[in-house]
């Protein structure tokens, strides 16, 4: 249990930030899942549209340290590559 005033405040702050980060992480994962489902169905147009919504979410999560920025970039790259393979 936090004893000092500043430690109590830090605990409240951590709780708020955790809630925000969980929400953003859930949004990011959901958008990625939609892209992956479209790829699994083989629906290239739906995958492209979903990717247009997912890429900004991933990059924003990387900028805000919800995930590491390289992880976000890697995820975007791999999804884009998989969508490109659908055209062939």
Swiss-Prot record:
SUPFAM superfamilies noted in UniProt: Ribosomal protein S20 (SSF46992)
Gene Ontology process terms (BP): translation
Cellular component annotations (GO), alphabetically ordered: cytosol; small ribosomal subunit
Domain of life the protein comes from: Bacteria
Keywords from the UniProt entry: Ribonucleoprotein, Ribosomal protein, RNA-binding, rRNA-binding
Alphabetized NCBIfam families for the sequence: S20
HAMAP family named in the record: Ribosomal_bS20
Name this protein carries in UniProt: Small ribosomal subunit protein bS20
Organism: Nitrobacter hamburgensis (strain DSM 10229 / NCIMB 13809 / X14)
Encoding gene per record: rpsT
């Amino acid at each position: 249990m936090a004893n000092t005033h500043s430690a109590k405040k830090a605990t409240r702050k951590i709780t708020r930030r955790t809630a925000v980060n969980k929400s953003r992480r859930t949004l990011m994962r959901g958008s990625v899942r939609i892209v992956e489902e479209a790829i699994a169905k083989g629906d290239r147009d739906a995958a492209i549209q979903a990717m247009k919504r997912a890429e900004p979410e991933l990059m924003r999560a990387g900028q805000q340290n919800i995930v590491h920025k390289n992880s976000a970039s890697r995820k975007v790259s791999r999804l884009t590559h998989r969508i490109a393979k659908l055209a062939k």
